Amino acid sequence: MLKFRLILTVLTVLLITVNGQFGVNIENKSSTSSSKSAASKPSGNFAIPTALRRPNPFLQRLPSAAADQEALFQSKTAQAQPQPSAQSTNKPSFQNGQQSGGNQPMYPNQPDPYQTGSYQGPYNSMNSNNNNPPTMAGPVPADRISYQPAPKNTVQSGYQQPMPGQQSMQVPNNGPSLPAGPSYDLHNQYPPQQN
């Protein structure tokens, strides 16, 4: 134990001595180097001499690349501009039900239904014979109506809820009548709640 303390003390003294010597030397060297560098530095912002600068190829290519891009843009815009012609018009013309010029119809192989009078109502995917465009124009013929809204089961719609086992009561505005027996709420499409 005594030997260990003695060795530790000797090492500590040596470390302090060496550190002091190197610290003095470092301070002396740093002071002399700082004085030399201060004398060699020019006043103001230090700029790299032009002869020492390495040329940047990207900066040298910029003007030519911009010119190439501009030439390419001009050529594309010249190609995109439509050439004027004597027959060019924006208004569509109909001949024998076929549309020419302007916006083309959705089904170019079929006559225009609005011009030929062959329009038969809205598009119905269940009817294979109806190939008209899925658009709506004018009144729909009665035989083409596939949806009839259910009347509301209220007094305002023309009839009252019948009592069980009785016929439905007509109201003054001649609305449709409901059959006798249990009925459903046609407006909400839900069965009545059973208590």
UniProtKB/Swiss-Prot annotation:
Q: Which residues form the signal peptide?
A: 1-20
Q: Which residues are glycosylated?
A: N28
**Keywords tagged on the record:** Glycoprotein, Secreted, Signal
Q: Compositionally biased, Polar residues: which spans?
A: 112-123, 151-176
The Low complexity compositionally biased stretches are 29-43, 74-104
Tell me where in or outside the cell this protein is found.
Secreted
Source lineage: Eukaryota, Metazoa, Spiralia, Lophotrochozoa, Mollusca
Q: Which organism is it from?
A: Lottia gigantea
Q: Where is this region: Disordered?
A: 26-195
Q: Name one GO cellular component term.
A: extracellular region
Query: In which tissues does this protein get expressed?
Result: Component of the acid-soluble organic matrix of calcified layers of the shell (at protein level).
Q: What is this protein called?
A: Uncharacterized shell protein 22
**Superkingdom, natural source:** Eukaryota
